[in-house]
Amino acid sequence: MAQRGQPWAVLLLVVAATAAVSSGQNPRGTTAPGGETFASRVVAANLGNPWEVTWGPDAHLWITERTAFRVTRVDPADGSRKVALTLDDVYQTSVQDGLMGMALHPDLLKSRGRDWVFLVSTYDADAGSGVTRRLRVRRYTYDPAAQTLGSPVTVIDDLPAHDDHGGGRILVGPDGKLYLSRGDQGSNWLANYCNAIHSQDLPTAAEIAARDWVSYQGKVLRLEVDGAIPADNPTIKGVRSHIFSYGLRNPQGLTFGPSGLLYASEHGPSTDDEIDLIQAGKNYGWPHVAGYNDDRSYAYANWSASSTPCASLEFTYTTPQARP
């Protein structure tokens, strides 16, 4: 098993707050179209690449530090911080792996026995000297007296992972289910161009029975809090699995709107970033479709299926003088 970490990046956490002040009182502020004025200030610095930032019921910011492998709580009033958890089994080598998504259970600090925090991280599943990168979700219990997270329980593990397009956002939905975004693992792209994209792949019943999650790439998953497949998940092509929607490239933003609709923000191939309304059983088209499917300069080329060995392919990049 190998474990690596990148040097910390010195990043600033900046929050924007509305304030009824004049431009003279807020020389660095920004006025929104509705007349609201936003001001910014540094709340915390020198964090290890903050990835998830969410408001907790304790009026603190809860933050995952992707390359420091920590969950840190920050008081926005004075910037004081408290480390709730440091993980020692995260594998991280690139800009899209490490300790990523975090979801606070709605019952956190409500004395209902569900002081739960869900964390998404990559790890090395190889027991030897090699590396087999995988992704898992664990549930931790928060101890308000000690202000720490403990008692980890694995919700799901052995999910495919790579060094790019990991997705990794997690939410607890209004229905009490977990929603987890999964990217296409950077396949068919840059250094990973010889890896096949699995965003359109769907599991067989045998794969689900064997807990083989190879097709869980380029998807939004929906899980029970214990990792089980919800009974009301969509049946897609005859199989019910954790898959809620598919055909996605790299959905890193995931949120529920005020009416209960689920939205995802998705990175496109250097163009066609999307805001998607995520619906049960829907196919969002990737890699055959990018954006509105109106970009005639985009065509899917599956390098892994080339008759010439993929690793020996050579690429020439040109910029046309005029576009159709």
Predicted regions and their residues:
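Bacterial N-terminal signal peptides that target proteins for export
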Residues: 1-10
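Bacterial N-terminal signal peptides
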Residues: 9-19
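Generic detector of low-complexity/intrinsically disordered segments
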Residues: 13-15, 151, 315
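Acidic, Gly/Ser/Thr-rich repeat motifs that build Ca2+-stabilized beta-propeller blades
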Residues: 24-190, 194, 253-256, 260-268
